[in-house]
Swiss-Prot record:
The keyword Repeat does not apply. Belongs to the RNA polymerase beta chain family. It comes from the Bacteria. The RNAP catalytic core consists of 2 alpha, 1 beta, 1 beta' and 1 omega subunit. When a sigma factor is associated with the core the holoenzyme is formed, which can initiate transcription. Its EC number is 2.7.7.6. The gene is rpoB. It catalyses: RNA(n) + a ribonucleoside 5'-triphosphate = RNA(n+1) + diphosphate. One of its GO terms (molecular function) is DNA binding. DNA-dependent RNA polymerase catalyzes the transcription of DNA into RNA using the four ribonucleoside triphosphates as substrates. It comes from Phenylobacterium zucineum (strain HLK1). Keywords: DNA-directed RNA polymerase, Nucleotidyltransferase, Transcription, Transferase. This is DNA-directed RNA polymerase subunit beta.
Length: 1356
């Protein structure tokens, strides 16, 4: 396989033995494809599928006015270009969105007064603006008000029908009560349920229950039809003293008759009473010619009539359908001359009389009564009329505007009920209700299985597109009402469509969804992995989902159908466990919203290249083998292979297997697949490991892991953190902020022949970490499309690099690694191994107040020159200034109202004759706990406000940058064009041309003598060539105009002024970069859930050291491994140790070669490590670069569940010249003595987590107080104090520390007068104070007074 540009520079040796059968899908495809389906932005208007926005418009339109004089129809929609690009939106705090224009057609009718016929009077079409729709960036995020947001996909119960029982919890007897529920996509829920007496009830929207037969009657069935639908009919004919009935063997299997069975034809006894009839005997009777049975009259007792028995002449009803036969009734019927009876086939064993009993309980007999009953339940208190009841019932389940099963619901319903109904029938039909009841009754009779609601076949994913579609529909429906009212109130003949439409409700619905929906989340931007996992998250919470409190254990648990779809490992710890999940690496979401997992087809024990994606429902029918089964030339070797059938793992014969997994890592999520030796870790720790990788802070210098899994490069590219080449080309120009690439493949004439990649420099992420991209290419490098050309945060050479490789020893050290503490070497701090940069953003606004405008200025009252040293003449801090807590970042003064003057102020006023104090200082100062360097300042001015010097300087710099981009692009375009012109002109015959070029053949030498700008003037005798010349010229002019237009647009936007909140004249944002070195109290972790807090930083000379004098970097506690069962970290240590040993050998061989040795020795060593199949670089320059990169350690990939074995690690340790045990003798840095036994030493990949002590530690002197209780606030954010609670008071009481207790409860807390006096006395240098009454006592007194109890304090 050809290696990528970065792949050549550092080759990762993989231990994977199982080839990948299918390429992993793009990791943020879920988000992108869903939103693309919603917008259908690239699809032409007439060709759009009926989904997304198109479906919403088609469902809401056409809109008719109340008297149907006019109708507003939807034609099509289109998006205009967004006003600002992504970068501009982030800087200006705008939403990245495109205006939506909808073409509507208003048709006005006129009615002929005589005939009443309608004819079209007028048709008007118009494009109407319908608000802005946010666009998704290439990274799968949205920019809303300048911040990156992610819409998390929601897991919810699929629409369809579900059968369940109460697990015996409802009734004291523990009897199972079955229930069926029809869940639509939108509309009323329909429940059918049994009660303890086996009567079937129906509930609509969980309201009061009614007998199920009431619902059937409302559907237009009568009692007789209901019974004939649910029960078979058995005919009985009077014969002598008994009743004859046809013999059916299946009815008598396993039955013990209470009376003898007699053959009606022969009169002989077939079977005696009380003897059980076996299935074999039942069949034998039929084979022997038994056709009709003669039963005693008692056999009919307890049976139910199937039809009404009526005397048609007199109209007298003798018995109704469903009546129970008893000897009296039977005798009466015989007397009336009934010789044949149709009886329901209910034997109370295999068929129960539940529907018949329900019909008996039901008071209603006619459809009208049933409709009234349903109306009373749905609208209690309203008197029902036939029309209202009919309309209400129809709108509940049979009106497509109110009720929608969705195509998913219909498909699920068809599958479960074995119906065959097209999936565009999205309302309930009578047949569906009957099928649901038949299935439910079958369950009660012991036939069939209940559904498992946690099966992924019954849960589906709603992604961005669908969530926004539902929200937009809500907005349009709100708008629909307003349109109808307006159509009726205006003169319909004169209005245009835009007069009828107010797009505010639709735009507000979209804004509300992105701004405040539970599923619209602030993107976790700590590092590239946290971004990617946030976009792949599946949440069961949110609108229409579960709540934390209601979700039980079953919903949260891992289900067999999660295999290959949802990761069983990655989920948060805490109340959300199991409710928030992550998509597995290879999983995709299908068009119905079900998660599918890929499998390879197996035919006759042989694997094929065919890969099929299956949902949980489809998979249930197949026998699936694991990915690690032994294969030889594609054929399964063993007769019994490990696999699963119906989710249950078992050993299966190879002949039965028809599918196999595509990869061992298809089970886990992206984060879990980044943990090497995951298979050797306990699941709880693996969970912590996956979650903590997402909290790793990007470091100044990252290392890719020596021991990786091969997923690192995929994550880096798919997350969008690195810059990937769009087209093949050559690097023309490069600096820290951009890369200019000239495309070399034949480019489309309409596209520029140059790509400019702007790099992000020191940008602030959502979590205040630093986003900084660094180029990896040099001028002249040839790159291919898809190559990584620049690294981003937490990446190195195009691979994810969340932390650093550190030399670790597992041993106790003077108690400093007690309870998972970590001891680190001073070298780590000195060399900035774990130093990170954090960028804090501060903003200040100058508003227009009632007393006058606030002003951003350097002229601040009562502030010395020292405090203003970093400010420029506009009062804004300079870039590069070092700032400390309390320093002024932006000087600002606010007008203050006239207050009485002190004598001193009056004197000043008299002397200087001007207002000395009409403004107060409201400058933006750096808060406590932050110090750093100013890296960026942005100034925003309201349109029409004069810009200060600083704003103009920033604007000039930005215009220069844009101009440079334009000029560079033009220069390359010019060079390209000259090359193409030269090719076209050389060898042709000139007819005329500029001065210096004679007629005749054009040669390269002649062309060189003429300025390239004049080549266009050459006229050729060849018409075809002349046509090409003209086409080139037009193309060149168009490209130049396009560049100029783009430049002018951007400059215009810069100079136009900014859209600021109301009342704000000017806004300044200041970005401060804070350098955070590692210090005691910071949290660190490995990738195996092995986390700890730094306890001490030890001088290098005191750290334990190896025999060659190398000090270890980190000392971890060995007791942290056995009980936690995350042995993966030990394997990683050994393999990392081998990697570093082999790297040293590469370095030695490289040095030998560079000092006159043999190149071959180095190549042979690399071949020995990588194996003969690995492709090594061709050129010496590339080989040297590779060897240099490998000298720190040879990187390995051990894919999850398919990684390195112990013997692999031991062999590599041996190759590296190290002990096969992976242990080494260490020496005590303090005494120089060797420790008694060898210690496990090696390289572990350590992460610094986003739990930094600087962000947590906090101290308060004087700060804000609570308004009512006057006690100090709590928490760092409020600059609060430490609470001295009840238990602490007991402690002081126990010590008898009365005075300390008194000051804690009064002057240090809520004694307002007392604390002011303390402050004054401290200022005076005095330390006496008096405690008064705490405010909380006054609050208590007031509370008592509010209850009518007067409390007065008496002086004693």
């Amino acid at each position: 396989m050809a290696q990528s540009f970065t792949g050549k520079k550092r080759i990762r040796k993989s231990f994977g033995r199982i080839p990948e059968a299918v390429q992993m899908p793009n990791l943020i495809e879920v988000q992108r494809s869903s939103y693309e389906q919603f917008l259908q932005r690239e699809v032409r208007a007439g060709e759009r599928r009926d989904e997304g926005i198109e479906a919403v418009f088609k469902s809401v339109f056409p809109i008719k006015d109340f008297n149907e004089r006019a109708v507003l129809e939807y034609v099509s929609y289109e998006f205009e270009e967004p006003k600002y690009d992504v970068e501009e939106c982030v800087q200006r705090d705008m939403t990245y969105a495109a205006p939506l224009k909808v073409k509507l057609r208003l048709i006005v009718f006129e009615t002929d007064e005589e005939t009443g016929a309608r004819s079209v009077k007028d048709i008007k079409e118009q494009d109407v603006y319908m608000g802005d729709i946010p666009l998704m960036t290439e990274k799968g995020t949205f920019i809303v008000n300048g911040t990156q947001r992610v819409i998390v996909s929601q897991m919810h119960r699929s629409p369809g029908v579900f059968f369940d029982h109460d697990k015996g919890k409802t009734h004291a007897s523990g009897k199972l009560l079955f229930a069926a529920r029809v869940i639509p996509y939108r509309g009323s829920w329909l429940d059918f349920e049994f009660d303890a007496k086996d009567i079937v009830y129906v509930r609509i929207d969980r309201r009061r229950k009614l007998p199920a037969t009431t619902f059937l009657m409302a559907l237009g069935m009568d009692g007789e039809e209901i019974l004939s639908t649910f029960y078979e009919t058995v005919p009985y004919e009077k014969k002598g003293d008994g009743w004859a009935t046809p013999y059916k063997p299946e009815r008598w299997r396993g039955v013990k008759p209470e009376f003898p069975l007699i053959d009606a034809d022969t009169g002989e006894e077939i079977a005696p009473a009380g003897q059980k009839i076996s299935a074999r005997n039942a069949k034998k009777f039929a084979d022997n010619g038994l056709k009709t049975l003669l039963l005693a009259p008692e056999a009919l007792t307890g049976r139910y009539l199937a039809k009404d028995l009526v005397n048609f002449e007199t109209g007298e009803i003798y018995a109704e359908a469903g009546d129970e036969l008893d000897p009296t009734l039977l005798a009466a019927l015989e007397e009336q001359g009934f010789t044949t009876l149709d009886v329901l086939d209910i034997d109370e064993v295999t068929v129960g009389a539940y529907i018949r009993n329900t019909l008996r309980v039901d008071k209603n007999t006619a459809r009208e009564d049933a409709l009234f009953d349903i109306y009373r339940v749905m609208r209690p208190g309203e008197p029902p009329t036939v029309e209202a009841a009919e309309a209400m019932f129809k709108s509940l389940f049979f009106d497509s505007e109110r009720y929608d099963l969705s195509s998913v619901g219909r498909v699920k319903m068809n599958m479960r009920l074995e119906l065959d109904c097209p999936d565009d029938v999205r309302v309930i039909r009578k047949e569906d209700v009957i099928a649901v009841l038949l299935t439910l009754v079958g369950l009660r009779d012991g036939r069939g299985e209940i559904d498992d609601i946690d099966n992924l076949g019954n849960r589906r994913v709603r992604s961005v597109g669908e969530l926004l579609e539902n929200q937009y529909r809500v907005g349009l429906l709100r708008m629909e009402r307003a349109i109808k009212e307006r159509m009726s109130s205006v003169d319909i003949d004169t209005v245009m469509p835009h007069d009828l439409i107010n797009a505010k409700p639709a735009a507000a619905a979209v804004r509300e969804f992105f701004g405040s929906s539970q599923l619209s989340q602030f993107m976790d931007q700590t590092n590239p992995l946290s971004e990617i996992t946030h976009k792949r998250r599946l949440s069961a919470l949110g609108p229409g989902g579960l709540t934390r409190e209601r979700a039980g254990f079953e919903v949260r648990d891992v289900h067999p159908t999660h295999y290959g779809r949802i990761c069983p490992i990655e989920t948060p710890e805490g109340p959300n466990i199991g409710l928030i999940n992550s998509l597995a690496t290879h999983a995709v979401v299908n068009k119905y919203g079900f998660i599918e997992s890929p499998y390879r087809r197996i035919r006759d024990g042989k694997t094929t290249d065919e890969v099929v994606y299956m949902s949980a429902m489809e998979e249930a029918k197949h026998v699936i083998a694991q990915a690690n089964i032994k294969l030889e030339n594609g054929e399964i070797v063993e007769d019994l292979v490990p696999g699963r059938i119906n989710g249950e793992p078992s050993l299966l014969p190879k002949a039965d297997v028809d599918l196999m997994d595509v990869s061992p890592k298809q089970v886990v999520s992206v984060a879990a697949s980044l943990i090497p030796f995951l298979e050797n870790d306990d699941a709880n720790r693996a969970l912590m490991g996956s979650n903590m990788q997402k909290q790793a802070v990007p470091l100044i210098q990252s290392d890719a892991p020596l021991v990786g899994t091969g997923m690192e490069s995929i994550v880096a590219v798919d997350s969008g953190a690195v810059v990937v080449a769009r087209r093949t080309g050559v690097v023309e120009q490069i600096d820290g902020t951009r890369i200019v690439v000239r495309a070399t493949e034949e480019t489309d004439p309409s596209k520029p022949g140059v790509d400019i990649y702007r790099l992000q420099k020191f940008q602030r992420s959502n979590t205040s970490t630093c986003i900084n991209q660094r180029p990896l290419v040099r001028v002249g490098d040839k790159i291919n499309a898809g190559d990584v050309i620049a690294d981003g945060p937490s990446t190195e050479l195009g691979e994810l690099a969340l932390g650093r490789n550190a030399l670790v020893a597992f041993m106790p050290w003077n108690g400093y690694n007690f309870e998972d503490s970590i001891l680190i070497s001073e070298r780590i701090v000195r060399d900035d191994v774990f130093t990170s940069i954090h960028i804090e953003e501060f903003e200040v606004m100058a508003r227009d107040t009632k007393l006058g405008p606030e002003e951003i200025t350097r002229d601040i009252p009562n502030v010395g020159e020292e405090a203003l040293r970093n400010l420029d003449e506009a009062g804004i801090v300079a870039i590069g200034a070092e700032v400390q807590p309390g320093d002024i970042l932006v000087g600002k003064v606010t007008p203050k109202g006239e207050s009485p003057m002190t004598p001193e102020e009056k004197l000043l006023r008299a002397i200087f004759g001007e207002k000395a104090s009409d403004v107060r200082d409201t400058s933006l100062r750096l808060p406590p706990g932050v110090s750093g360097t100013i890296v960026e300042v942005r100034v925003f001015n309201r349109h029409g406000v004069d810009k200060d010097e600083r704003a103009l300087a920033i604007e000039r710099a930005e215009i220069d940058r844009l101009g440079k981009d334009r000029d560079d692009e033009f220069a390359i375009l010019n060079r390209n064009m000259q090359g193409r012109l030269r090719q076209l002109l050389v060898g042709k015959t000139a007819v005329s041309g500029p001065k210096g070029l004679g007629r005749g053949e054009i040669t390269a030498e002649k062309l060189e003598e003429i300025a390239p700008g004049l080549w266009w003037q050459i006229a050729l005798d060849d018409e075809k060539a002349m046509g090409e010349l003209e086409a080139l010229r037009k193309q060149f002019d168009d490209a130049r105009k396009r560049l100029d237009r783009r430049f002018e647009d951007k400059v215009d936007k810069l100079q136009r002024g900014d859209e600021l909140p109301p009342g704000v004249m000017k806004m300044v944002k200041v970005f401060v970069a804070v350098k955070r070195k590692l210090q005691p109290g910071d949290k660190m972790a490995g990738r195996h859930g092995n986390k700890g807090v730094i306890s001490k930083i030890l001088p290098i000379e005191d750290m334990p050291y190896l025999e060659d004098g190398t000090s270890v970097d980190i000392v971890l506690n060995p007791l942290g491994v056995p009980s936690r069962m995350n042995v993966g970290q030990i394997f990683e240590t050994h393999l990392g140790w081998a990697a570093a040993g082999l790297g040293k050998q590469v370095q030695r061989l490289l040095e030998d070669w560079q000092h006159g040795g043999q190149k071959q020795a180095l190549i042979e060593h690399l071949r020995d490590v990588y194996g003969p199949d690995e492709e090594l670089p061709d050129t010496e320059e590339e080989l040297v670069e590779l060897a240099r990169n490998l000298s720190k350690g040879i990187p390995f990939a051990t894919p999850v569940f398919d990684g390195a074995h112990i013997d692999d690690i031991e062999n590599l340790l041996e190759k590296a010249g190290l002990d096969r045990s992976g242990q080494s003798y260490l020496y005590d840095g303090q005494s120089g003595e060797r420790f008694k036994r060898p210690v496990t030493v090696g390289y572990i990949y350590m992460l610094k987590l986003h739990h930094l002590v600087d962000d947590k530690i906090h101290a308060r002197s004087i700060g804000p107080y609570s308004l009512v209780t006057q006690q100090p606030l709590g928490g760092k954010a409020q600059f609060g104090g430490q609470r001295f609670g009840e238990m602490e008071v007991w402690a002081l009481e126990a010590y008898g520390a009365a005075y300390t207790l008194q000051e804690m409860l009064t002057v240090k807390s809520d004694d307002v007068a007392g604390r002011t006096k303390v402050y004054e006395s401290i200022v005076r240098g005095d330390d006496t104070f008096e405690a008064g009454i705490p405010e909380s006592f006054n609050v208590l007194v007031k509370e008592m007074r509010s209850l009518g109890l007067n409390v007065e304090l008496e002086n004693s």
